[in-house]
Curated annotation (Swiss-Prot):
Keywords: Cell cycle, Cytoplasm, Hydrolase, Protein phosphatase
Molecular function per GO: protein serine/threonine phosphatase activity; protein tyrosine phosphatase activity
One CC-aspect GO term: cytoplasm
Domain of life according to the entry: Eukaryota
Catalytic residues, chain numbering: 140
Name of the protein in its database record: Cyclin-dependent kinase inhibitor 3
PROSITE patterns named among the record's database cross-references: TYR_PHOSPHATASE_2, TYR_PHOSPHATASE_DUAL
Gene coding for it: Cdkn3
Originating organism: Rattus norvegicus (Rat)
Single Gene Ontology BP annotation: regulation of cell cycle
Enzyme's top EC category: hydrolase
Bias (Acidic residues) ranges: 13-24
Length: 212
């Protein structure tokens, strides 16, 4: 019988180690002012807290504590559960709830768009949070594609006076030129109002026919 092989600690891949507290920068939250859509609140956007992927090595506990200390009361998560596992934060939604942060999970595929019914639900939930003066944060993986799309849709939802391009510009002012990442997302935003109006009209028609 061969003796067990002795493995030195230095032989292990150390890439999974948590970064030391002084190595990790605070999680960066961008605050989108909603004053131009007649709302005094700000909407927070950020990248995925606790993410461990490629050269990103964040500490999930530390990030969540920072969100809580920032006063975040509601968080909207657009990552799929598969993504949360891939980026090593499979229990993120549970952790938010443990910290007393109300969690709204609306998974949208990376680079994709929500169906209009789901988007309307997100708009209603966001509008309710903001109306009740709750400090609200939204995020996907990078905080640029899906999150910025939803935030831009919210601007169009809250005001008829803002154009799709103005909404995109507002997001790029706070998140940089990478906001709204795909042609699909760009087109979705430009068609959002018409599609939402058609969806709500058909929904009302169905409701009336059922109530007869």
């Amino acid at each position: 019988m061969k003796p067990p092989i002795s493995i030195q600690a230095s032989e292990f891949d150390s890439s999974d180690e948590e970064p030391a507290d002084d190595e990790q920068t605070p999680i960066q939250i961008s605050w989108l002012p909603l004053s131009r859509v007649n709302c005094s609140q700000f909407l927070g956007l950020c990248a995925l807290p606790g993410c461990k992927f490629k050269d990103v090595r964040r500490n999930i506990q530390k990030d969540t504590e920072e969100l809580k200390s920032s006063g975040i009361q509601d968080v909207f998560v657009f990552c799929t559960r598969g993504e949360l596992s891939k980026y090593r934060v499979p229990n993120l939604l549970d952790l938010y709830q443990q910290y007393g942060i109300v969690t709204h999970h609306h998974p949208i595929p990376d680079g994709g768009t929500p169906d209009i019914g789901s988007c309307w639900e997100i708009m209603e939930e966001l509008a309710t949070c903001l109306k009740n003066n709750r400090k609200t944060l939204i995020h996907c993986y990078g905080g640029l594609g899906r999150s910025c799309l939803v935030a831009a849709c919210l601007l169009l939802y809250l005001s008829d006076s803002i154009s799709p391009q103005q909404a995109i510009d507002s997001l790029r002012d706070v998140r940089g030129s990478g906001a709204i990442q795909t042609i699909k997302q760009y087109n979705y935003l430009h068609e959002f109002r018409d599609k939402l109006a058609a969806y709500l009209s058909s929904r009302d028609s169905l409701s009336r026919s059922v109530s007869r």
